[in-house]
Amino acid sequence: MRIGMVSATYDPSVINGAVRMVTLYKQHLEALGHEVTIFTLGDDQDSDRAAGIVRSPGFRLGDHGYFVGLRYSREAQMLLTEMEVVHCHHLLMSVEMAHRYARCPIVYTNHTRYDLYTGAYTPLPQPAADAIMRQLWPEFAGLADTVIAPSASVRQLLLDFGVREPIVVIENGIELEPFLRPHRPRARADFGLPDDVFLLVYVGRLSSEKNVLGLLEQVARACQVVPELHLAIFGKGPQEDELRAKVTALALDACVHFMGVVPFDEVGDWLAAADAFVTASTSEVHPLTVIEAMAAGLPIAAVQSPGIVDCVASGVTGFMPTEGEGLDSAIVALAANPARARAMGEAARAASRRFDIGRTVALTVELYESLLATRPDQQRDDPHGRWSRRTEKWAGLLDQLAQLVRPSDEGDEGARRWWPAGTTAAPGEQDE
């Protein structure tokens, strides 16, 4: 098959869970004999036609590596018309691009909690973020023929937000081997620690939606019970300076270690030195870092939330308190009984085998084939006319968004600075 992978961003601009899944899909689909082309936005000079990566020009969004673009290059448009299946991996600047240019079945995988990210990265209070996503999520997802949810709990979330396209559950997968059998397993000495400490590890972005601040507070409480507790943090992000200050404020400088970013093929080596994996995030869809830690034989201490509950069996492969405030007790329970923690880690390793990327790709290919059998080579009815009508509808949604966030006289000053007083138009779209 000629398969197009459409992503709003791609390596090297951004490396996150969605980008990693696109890379894994490409590698394994090509190993099966399929022809895969990645379509994304970015600096056109970074395109690598020989490797099957086509970037269309976009405007850089700050210094985070993301780009904004309203159309694909002529080359990308033409190539998309030649695809037999298009698989999209972002809600915005992905599905709508495929809908405009492709003439084949479109699949969309929902990798992100857009409701929580909208609340975290805009001045919107969470109820307002939820309200706008109840409009945008079904509208954009509705451009696809089938939606993939990486977990059952995320399928329910999509239904709750009004997505009505056929939704199938295909769990994200990983390359298990580097975690099951690390090439160069690390030891406590590589952290500068003695062998008798209990070492927790967190791997992920250092940003507000991951709730690393909350994790530090829970670790501080656990350290009062288990003084030999240590936490190694792998990753970078916009909250790093704030997190370092929080560590000092909590008097955790001696037991929290910021390890920065290590090459991905070395992550399994570092996990091999840890006793447990911890996260306080409630914004996950199907967390690859949790699955990787399980494959490395680590028990999980995490907050019960969508995505997490589909990976971790509480009391078997780790502990999942229903509230973040109970995470310290989960950590203490693991540290106080190392033998039980090791047994849970072995159970986690066994459970991780169902997340093999080969299984994920096989199920996805079955989905592609079923769509091709029932909806081959679709000629979409006047896609540009439908696009124009949809943009008019989206302009109305933006006006609703403006009504939601425009501050009152007693409103939030932060929102007032972000949104011009006396207008209901989106920034850059005020009436002339």
Region locations from a protein language model:
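Nucleotide-activated donor-binding/catalytic signature segment of Leloir-type glycosyltransferases, i.e.
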Residues: 244-262
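Carbohydrate-associated surface elements
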Residues: 153, 173
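A short helix/loop element that forms part of the nucleotide-sugar donor recognition site in Leloir-type
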Residues: 73-75, 180-193
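Short hydrophobic beta-strand element within catalytic cores of glycosyltransferases
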Residues: 299-302
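Conserved donor-binding/catalytic core segment of Leloir-type glycosyltransferases
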Residues: 194-219
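Aromatic "clamp/platform" in nucleotide-sugar-dependent glycosyltransferases that forms part
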Residues: 91, 282
